[in-house]
Amino acid sequence: MCNLISAGFYKIKKSRVFWTGMVLVNIWSAFLTVQAHFNSLAETIPYTFEDGLFVIETIMILVIAIFVSLFFGTEYSDGTLRNKLIGGYTRAQIYVSQFVVNAAACLLIYFSSILVSGILGLFLMGAEGVSAMKIVVYIVAGAGMCITDAALFTFLTVSVGTKAGASVAGLLLGFSLLCGAMAVHDKLSQEEYMYIPKTEQGGDISVITEDTELMKVPNPYYVFGAKRKALEFLLDINPSGQAVQLAALELFRPGAVIIYDTALTALFCSLGVFIFKKRNLK
């Protein structure tokens, strides 16, 4: 299987899809970091480089969906998988080696974006007040998210069986997971209490000044109890939910996230091998 992985890395080195994705992601990372810097100047908010370090996370699922579907999907169209079978490799070896190559390529794109954002952000905004341990934990969690995404879309590509179909299905799934994650995160971000102006009955609250008295009232949109636990679970187990939390610097359960990523990666790999064994390769 080492030969399969080595051959896969050689293809990555020659892949236009891989290099295009890496360049575009790095450009976007640099742009977001510079934007965070100018926001700190305009709003007089003491931003640090970590504020622009993980914002790229939210689009990584889309980048990985496109890359895996195009790169791995090409293996179907050019007969490479069939040739590997003829060469004496088992279907399990072929699938696992392809996943390893896909995951490694996605990690290279991810780490390159972190490196660009980190160096640029450190130069522009400094590192005062930054927690090195927090950054390390977040980077590890982000890497786990990328590996899980690679496992998911490798499985999806095998399930669909065509490059074009896998690309469309991957983007649709990626957007769905991202939109769902943002909706759940928005619900969980509601404060338990809200403050409204305290006025006499029928009083005018159209004008609020520094002297206006505020009263604390329960927020009707705050989610609590079992429903909140369920939403937290959905956010943590969804790779895009992890990305949204990382981008907001609000990953409160990193241990659980890493466990979920490990379990999902194993699940998608197992299902992928099972389906690939049933595939009739042309």
Regions found by a protein language model. Name each.
Residues M1-M22:
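Aromatic- and glycine-rich beta-strand/loop motifs that create alpha-glucan
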Residues C2, M22, I237-K282:
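Alpha-helical transmembrane segments of multi-pass membrane transporters/translocases
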Residues R16-F18, R91, K163, L281:
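Membrane-helix interface/capping residues of multi-pass secondary transporters
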Residues F18, N26-F71, V96-G170, L178, ...:
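Secretory targeting signals
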Residues V68-G87, R91:
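Transmembrane helix boundary and interhelical loop/hinge segments in multi-pass membrane proteins
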Residues G79, S97-Q98, R279:
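Structural detector for helix-capping/boundary residues
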